[in-house]
Structure formats: C-alpha cells, structure tokens
Amino acid sequence: MLVFGTRPEAIKMAPLVKEFQKHPESFETIVCVTGQHREMLDQVLKLFEITPDYDLNIMRQGQDLYDVTARVLVGMRDVLREATPDVVLVHGDTTTSTAAALAAFYQQIPVGHIEAGLRTHNIYSPWPEEMNRQITGRIATYNFAPTRLSKQNLMREDVSPDSILVTGNTVIDALRQVVRKIKTDAELDKELEGVLLRSGYDVNRLVEGKRLVLITGHRRENFGDGFIHMCTAIKDLTRKYPEVDFVYPMHLNPNVRKPIHEVFGGDLSDLGNMFFIEPLEYLSFVYLMEKSTIVLTDSGGIQEEAPGLGKPVLVMRDTTERPEALAAGTVKLVGTDYDKIVSEVSALLDDTAYYDAMSQAVNPYGDGLACGRIVEFLNQRK
C-alpha cells in the first residue's frame, strides 16, 4: 500500500505506483490518499492516471497540524484493518507520512520510507518536516535513501545498513517522464502555453534572449517577517532588472498571500515585469520551470528538480536537508535575508561564468531509475 496526501508526495510517489502496477504477478498495488492538499493532489492523480483505492478526504477549512494528524491516524486505522497490506510505503516528511507510518506501526505492519535519511539536524527548521521525517525514520523497516549521504545519516542513527537502499530520488523519475511527454507532443506544448496564459503569464514574452526568474514560496517557518523580507527583495529586483520577467505562482495559503499584498499592494494584475499567477499543476509548472533562467524558492523538491533541467536554484531558507545539492554547486542558500537574495540573483543575472558554474553542475539526485530499484528490493524480500 502506498499512502500520500500532498502534491509533492504525489509527484514523487506517482512513478512508483506506476512501476508497481507493471508487476501484477508480484504485487497487488493499493493506493490510499489522505487529501492533505486536495485540489493540487487531484491534479497530479489525473496527470499520472492514478485512481486511489482509498481516499480519506481529510481537508477541512481552518484545520491545523493537530487536526491533520488525528484525521490521518484514525482514517488509516480503518483502511489498514480492511486492506491488510504486507507493507505500507510513505514518502518524505509530511504529516500524512508520519501519521500513516504510526498507524501502520500500531498494527505491526512494516513501513517503507521513500526519501529516507534527509536531515538538517534542527527540529524547527524546516518545521514540522524535520521532526516528521525523524519520527518516520524510527518507525520504518525499509529505508529508501536518495543519496549516499542520506544513508550515512541513517547509519549514524543506528539504522541497520541491511534495511537501507540508495535509490536516487523518485522525483527525477517523475520529472523525466513529464519532460519527455512535453517535448514529444506539440499539441500538449501548445495546450500548456494556453494554461500559462489563462493563469496570468504569456510565455511568448520569452523571445530574443529575454530571461525569467521563477519564484515559489510557502514554508511555514518563513511566515511573517521572513515573507516580508523575501517579497521586498523581489520587488526591488524587478525594478533593478526591468528587462527580466519575475513569475510567482502563488500558494493558496493566506499566510503566503497576505505579505505579498502588503509589499506589492492590493492590485497584483499590472506590475510591469512582475507576474503573480495562480498555482500551477505539476505539468504546467515543469513547463514553466524548463523555460526559466533562475529558480528562487523555499521548496525542498525543487532543489532536486530544477538542477535536473540545468537551472540554478537559490533557496530562501536558512538550512537545507539536501546538502548534496550545496556540495554539488547546484543550489545556494540565501535565507530570507534581503541583501543575500538581491546579491545572489544579481550575480546570476550579471555574471555568465557564475551562472554557467551552477547551471552546468551535475545533479546529485539520480538517473531516473529509482522506482525500479525500490520495486526490485521489495520483490526480493517477499
């Protein structure tokens, strides 16, 4: 059984679902979604043509982490009793993953942790994700680490090496499938151009070398002053580089939208080279990311995806659980510090050699074959 509930989880678990479904003689594949990110989750399910066997549909207006944890835990109790899976696979660091792993543990069902071993060693950064993944790691029977460093983190916590498989990251599997789909389908390319236009950005502006800075931001630890600093830096960059487009697909969370309006004003529809657009489904986001020059983000997954497309990533967080990307030179930490954000974006836009060093660095997160390795590992342990 594969359990997930947010869009990032769905993106990384979808190619694994499809890989298991290729082997019906060896596996009965059961999919349970929690609906922690309802609308954005459904978009990914549609893209990868996945129909869940169970849907907890936990999303409620005004819910907090207590509500999510309780609803997933109780909902999974009943699902696990009915389905009686041999193993439960969860992904990463979400509240869905931790609560589902705990529910499986309560019924003594083995847990497999996809993207295991990521650590910042600071339980409040990112919050609550760092503690979520540490708890899930303690419960897991099988640990699928994306990199050797992730494996080393687990071994330092006395996790048995026999339970760990270094796989690469399944997000690269998903990314390669989607990019291949876009590049080989002219009709789809045109359709995605239309999706972007309806969302608020015309990709036909990107002619004659015009550059695009793609921005995403949604992390809880940045709410408040952090987002104000980020938005102020972005606003000043749009003025410094009027010939560059800045595009920000806004997260639905009001804690994200409020500081944007505080810095940029109430009307976001006519800001010159600054484009605030509606959230994008995964396919459209990859399409836009492929056309970007730089990615400015506080996301975890984008630190893995964007370098796979040769895009430098500036991370608006103080820590990252992906130090392999820092070591490889594909990402740089800028935090929510105004001066760092402005100076690093400026350096990438002004210095070709600096830009090339980041964009041409080798992505440390795998070759797109992670899902096959996970399926083979579990097949050998039946």
Regions found by a protein language model. Give the residues of each.
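Nucleotide-activated sugar donor-binding and catalytic core shared by glycosyltransferases
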Residues: M1-Y248, P254-K382
